[in-house]
């Protein structure tokens, strides 16, 4: 079987091999995830895992077949890192942006959006609508990879994207800071056109397959339903985000 043509590893943020990954960690490169060969007990891989975790990087144990599929050089030595295209922002960066604009915070929370195209499209929508930031969880989510950046049409460079260990814990923190949380849900308890999005608001967008996770949905102040008039009963993540965000824009302009 012919090998696929090697792609430009630098262009899509893939860093392969033990020395290259260790050097990237030492240099403080913004790394999205590190994939390690499952079951490999080599001390060098253990050192990489410990260093990564100490720096807050997500470490994923993957079988060698997955690493072989990801590899561009076919010499990954049991470790592949995927670099983030830019450093993650903090929650404070998002609040600061709202303060600088003299606006009530408008934040998008992405619950387990694992498809990078969906995440990129949501980030693009959020930036266009003037949201102050996007938040993703560290696990079970796409990160700021090259695919996400490309799908966002460059929006990742213009809006803060923060990454948190626990989305539910962050939601509770936002609530303490006076932010109302609205989750998009097919059978929501509030109609889109009855939701008051003029004040400090966070909009939660769940995954296309299963929507919001149970704990996230339970932590929302309101679950918001979008009127559906056709035979298809769901929208993709970026379309749902666009509808809620632009309803917030409409309310804030009027």
Feature locations, PLM:
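N-terminal positively charged helical leader segments and presequences
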Residues: 1-97
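Conserved RecA-like P-loop NTPase ATPase core
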Residues: 17, 118, 126, 181, ...
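RNA substrate-binding interface of SAM-dependent RNA methyltransferases
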Residues: 26-30, 36, 46, 57, ...
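Short basic, glycine-rich beta-strand/loop surfaces that mediate nucleic-acid
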Residues: 70-84, 155, 160, 198-206
């Amino acid at each position: 079987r012919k090998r696929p043509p090697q792609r430009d590893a630098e262009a899509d943020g893939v860093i392969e091999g033990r020395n290259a990954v260790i050097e990237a960690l030492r240099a403080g490169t913004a790394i999205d995830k590190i994939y390690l060969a499952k079951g490999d007990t080599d001390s060098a891989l253990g050192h990489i895992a410990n260093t990564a975790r100490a720096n807050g990087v997500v470490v994923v144990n993957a079988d060698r077949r997955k690493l072989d599929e990801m590899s561009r050089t076919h010499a990954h030595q049991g470790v592949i890192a995927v670099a983030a295209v830019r450093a993650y922002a903090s929650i404070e960066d998002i609040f600061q942006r709202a303060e600088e604009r003299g606006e009530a915070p408008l934040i998008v929370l992405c619950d387990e959006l694992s498809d990078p195209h969906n995440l990129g499209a949501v980030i693009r929508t959020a930036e266009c609508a003037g949201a102050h930031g996007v938040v993703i969880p560290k696990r079970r989510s796409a990160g700021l990879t090259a695919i996400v950046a490309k799908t966002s049409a460059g929006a990742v460079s213009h809006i803060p994207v923060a990454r948190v260990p626990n989305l539910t814990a962050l939601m509770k923190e936002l609530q303490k800071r006076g932010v109302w949380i609205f989750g998009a849900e097919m059978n929501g308890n509030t109609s889109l056109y009855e939701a008051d999005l003029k004040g400090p608001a966070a909009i939660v967008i769940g995954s296309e397959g299963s929507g919001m996770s149970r704990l996230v949905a339970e932590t929302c102040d309101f679950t918001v339903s979008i009127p559906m008039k056709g035979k298809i009963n769901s929208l993709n993540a970026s379309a749902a985000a666009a509808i809620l965000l632009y309803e917030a824009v409409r309310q804030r302009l009027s």
